[in-house]
Amino acid sequence: MDKITPETEALREAYEALNRNDIQGFMKIFAPDIERIEPPGFPMAGTYHGLEAVKEHVSQGRGTWAEGACEPERFIVADDKVVVLLHVRVRRKDHTDWIDGRLGDVYTFRDGKAIQFRTFAEPQEALEWVGVEDSRED
């Protein structure tokens, strides 16, 4: 489950790029037919198809940050999927309060590229969606 693979390394690099506002660097992991799913209740909820739509979505979302980061805490590989458990701590440009929480992103890979990028409001939801249990004791 927790292991280093080419996909987990690519994701680690992608989040590093996102945190320094390098959108093009973040986009390197995606296949041309990428599908982005952001859940209801999130500021930019919806489904986005293709590189340009996903790039615009990510650029708009990242553009709201005044400061902060999305820090991967764990990468869990399950067949063609990688669950990324994240600690998100950001302050948006239009707020003084910090957003601080944990969520789960799930990436589905084909031929070394992500074909789907789905976010879950709760890490456990991401794990359940791919059918794995979090066996780590916190």
Residue ranges of predicted features:
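Residue-level signal for the nucleotide or nucleotide-sugar donor/cofactor binding architecture
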Residues: 6, 21, 49
